[in-house]
Each structure stands twice: as structure tokens, then as C-alpha cells.
């Protein structure tokens, strides 16, 4: 299992938490970005800066992630593409994306984008705070534990 981060949109605090969890659990982290980033100084962390272009980082992430991996992203359409590929997805505020909630999340994202485009609503989320960091840490721990259990179960089953 690898952890993928949509690094352009992920708060630094959340990236640091992912690195801590990865070190503890001996997992690889792949940060994918369209802009240069500072790579944390750990051997388990890799940084890929893709060539600029619309959704180039998202496309790379979807192409490289494999079923059973985890992706950290706040981009709902990206999360939808990953979920369809059986890659778990979690946003930096601790909200898990899954097949059951993707329809609602996509509809809400599109509604909010329409309202912003019409000038009926201001842009963006609230600043990333301590409550977000704690919710993310808790959700990340739960999700990594579940994914590791699932991977161990698959590995213990005889191949047919």
C-alpha cells in the first residue's frame, strides 16, 4: 500500500501528518504536484512534479495509484476517479470519500461552483485549523488500519 498526496492542494500540516504516519507504519508516500514543492527529508517520501497542464497532476495520480492505495485529496472529481479505481480517498479535513457518498459530494461541489460563478457565494473553505488537523489525524489512522487489515487478509487468502 502506498499513500498518494495531491500536493498542490494539501495543507502543509496534513502533509506532515501523513509523513509521520508513513514513517511509523513503514509506508511509501508519493507527493504529486503541478508546482515545485519542498520534499520532506525522509527516504519513504517521493515527490513527482508533473509538467504543467490542466489536471496533469490528477491524471498522473490516477494512472499510478493502485487498488488498495490511499490518496489524500480535496478535489471531488479526482476522488471520484480514484474511488472508481478502488483507491481509498480522504480529504485533508478527515472526510472519507467512498462509492456511497460520491454522488452527493459531486452534486454539492457542482452546486457550490455554480453559486460562486453566479456571484451568489464567496469562494473557498475556512482556514485549516487545529480541529481539521485532529479530524484528519483520527481519520487517517482509522483508514490506514482498515486498509492494512484488508491487505493482510488478501495476502493470506490462497490464490486461485
Swiss-Prot record:
Classification via Pfam families: DUF188 (PF02639)
InterPro entries: UPF0178 (IPR003791)
Chain ranges passing through the membrane: none
Family: Belongs to the UPF0178 family.
NCBIfam families the record matches: PRK00124.1
Name recorded for this polypeptide: UPF0178 protein PLES_56411
Organism, as annotated: Pseudomonas aeruginosa (strain LESB58)
Amino acid at each position: 500500500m502506498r499513500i498518494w498526496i495531491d500536493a498542490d492542494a494539501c495543507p502543509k500540516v496534513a502533509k506532515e501528518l501523513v509523513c509521520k504516519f508513513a514513517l511509523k507504519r513503514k509506508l511509501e508516500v508519493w507527493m504529486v504536484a503541478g508546482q515545485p514543492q519542498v520534499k520532506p527529508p525522509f527516504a519513504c517520501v517521493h515527490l513527482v512534479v508533473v509538467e504543467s497542464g490542466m489536471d496533469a497532476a490528477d491524471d498522473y495520480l490516477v494512472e499510478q495509484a493502485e487498488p488498495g492505495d490511499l490518496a489524500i485529496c480535496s478535489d471531488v472529481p479526482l476522488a471520484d476517479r480514484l474511488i472508481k479505481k478502488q483507491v481509498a480517498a480522504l480529504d485533508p479535513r478527515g472526510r472519507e470519500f467512498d462509492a456511497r457518498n460520491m454522488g452527493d459530494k459531486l452534486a454539492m461541489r457542482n452546486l457550490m461552483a455554480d453559486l460562486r460563478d453566479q456571484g451568489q457565494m464567496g469562494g473557498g473553505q475556512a482556514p485549516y485549523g487545529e480541529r481539521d488537523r485532529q479530524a484528519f489525524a483520527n481519520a487517517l489512522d482509522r483508514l490506514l488500519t482498515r486498509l492494512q487489515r484488508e491487505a493482510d487478509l488478501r495476502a493470506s487468502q490462497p490464490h486461485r
